[in-house]
Amino acid sequence: GVARARELAKRINAPLSIVDKRRERPGEVAEMTIIGDVRGKKCIIVDDICDTAGTLCKAAEVLIENGAAEVHSYITHGVLSGPAVERISNSVMKSLVITDSIQATGPVAKASNIRIVPTAPIFAQAILNIWNGTSVSSLFETETLEPIYDGQLQRLL
């Protein structure tokens, strides 16, 4: 988690802050602490998966309480079950971006602050690159992603 966050912060030339969570028991977050200064900053939460969005929405709330100007979240796998959509819709998060690795339910697709990025274009390009014997790691560069998503990248993100 932290190594990926550090790499992302470096790529977008932004300072790194961390939301450290402590659990008393599984499924319950007892305490969240912000490591770093978020005052006046647009914060980006990055995680691999989100189910009911309780922890995600709490993290966004703690960031705002610590002076963040805005909070946006990017989650690879948006399970978004149970109360997730309602929590996200009512949260302080300005936006949540997920991929289509899990098929979106109707409420997820209709939520005004949830955007879904299709994975097919990048997977297709990865397969083509492997077939052609060219670099797959180049797919992690913005200059390579823009043409794959045909100029849609800024709208999606």
Residue ranges with predicted function:
Residues 1-157:
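PRPP-associated nucleotide enzymes
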